[in-house]
Amino acid sequence: MAAQASEELEKLKLNGQNGHAQEQVSAADEAADNDDSEDDEKEEEGGAEGAATGAAKKKKKRKPKKKKKGGAKKQSSPPRVPISELFPNNQYPEGEIVEYKDENNYRTTNEEKRYLDRMNNDFLQEYRHGAEVHRQVRQYAQKNIKPGQTLTEIAEGIEDAVRALTGHQGLEEGDNIKGGMGFPCGLSINHCAAHYTPNAGNKMVLQQGDVMKVDFGAHINGRIVDSAFTMTFDPVYDNLLAAVKDATNTGIREAGIDVRMSDIGAAIQEAMESYEVEINGTTYPVKAIRNLNGHNIEQHIIHGGKSVPIVKGGDQTKMEEGEVFAIETFGSTGKGYVRDDMETSHYAKVSNAPSVSLRLSSAKNLLNVINKNFGTLPFCRRYLDRLGQDKYLLGLNNLVSAGIIQDYPPLCDIKGSYTAQYEHTIVLRPTVKEIISRGDDY
């Protein structure tokens, strides 16, 4: 999920041994069946002899057939099997492990740092759990999203899958705070770069020539995995996507303990702006969107207060040990600058919200619903609809005006331009950097 500069701040191991085990079970079953057939023949012969000599012998009892053992559970299509059932020992796949650069090399071998890393196991398993949810949901989405589908259909399909795989439907009070959607599924099209998800009644349909940013979060116990990718259906945009993917990977490579944010931004911009893209006979330089940033993530808080720029200059703040960051970059064929535009859908309660006396009963009631169901996690209007709330806009706007709720309008470059996004969540462990959301797809 994007942070705006101007605002306040492996794989499932389901094959391998299982396949071999299933072959052994099948062979055992076949052998058992053959034994049963031989027993039946002997029984018939014995029955004939018994007719002549009397019932001197007892009939052999038929051996019960061995039941086939069920293999390890597999993910369904669409994804609905909770990830915890696929990993019953609660040990989830690691992300990509990268050693620190240069002066931080000692961290990989330092005994004290290794001890601290082991102490963080629960924290890491919650993040890895959420990351595996994200990977499985997005890989299904990438295969099944097609032009002609409505944005509502796409968003709800992703969100339903995340809720199923985390095991949290979010319909009971407090359930979504334990796990589920880390923030609403963003589906920002073409010149719109971020923070767009359909509100109720939206009829927008994905078109063949669209460039769609898919940005969603999955969380376990408030450990939000924030990762995004861009989908296109025309190879003309390939260079735009390549530029942004390269820029994001550059940012990930440069990130580390004690690294200055400004240095990361400079490296990202250099990588991004080395590309150009030709669309309809016109060549466009790919520009980094200078007022969009990555950000650190805290428990139940998607924008933790630190920003990771994607252009040079500015913030001299350093990354610190134990922090979690969303490294995200945005490229554009337009001005490389976004403004608020279109109807707002994303909202979140401010973590240090002021204590304000609310006059509107609708605002008081709505705040109570938000506190119990989302806390400081971002939500959208569709989520309020899903909880049975209605006629809430007046109260919602009142909460925004009071500074209790922050609204996040869609962020757009100039019309006619195209924007792309890639994003990963990284954990700055004491010994190594873990790209928690890395997958085979990006």
Curated annotation (Swiss-Prot):
Its EC number is 3.4.11.18. Binds 2 divalent metal cations per subunit. Has a high-affinity and a low affinity metal-binding site. The true nature of the physiological cofactor is under debate. The enzyme is active with cobalt, zinc, manganese or divalent iron ions. Most likely, methionine aminopeptidases function as mononuclear Fe(2+)-metalloproteases under physiological conditions, and the catalytically relevant metal-binding site has been assigned to the histidine-containing high-affinity site. Keywords: Aminopeptidase, Cytoplasm, Hydrolase, Metal-binding, Protease. Substrate binds at H195, H303. Signal peptide: none annotated. It is an enzyme of class 3 (hydrolase). CDD domains: MetAP2 (cd01088). It is found in: Cytoplasm. Residues 1-92 are annotated as: Disordered. GO terms for molecular function: initiator methionyl aminopeptidase activity; metal ion binding; metalloaminopeptidase activity. A divalent metal cation 2 binds at D226, H295, E328, E423. Belongs to the peptidase M24A family. Methionine aminopeptidase eukaryotic type 2 subfamily. Cotranslationally removes the N-terminal methionine from nascent proteins. The N-terminal methionine is often cleaved when the second residue in the primary sequence is small and uncharged (Met-Ala-, Cys, Gly, Pro, Ser, Thr, or Val). This is Methionine aminopeptidase 2-1. It comes from Talaromyces marneffei (strain ATCC 18224 / CBS 334.59 / QM 7333) (Penicillium marneffei).
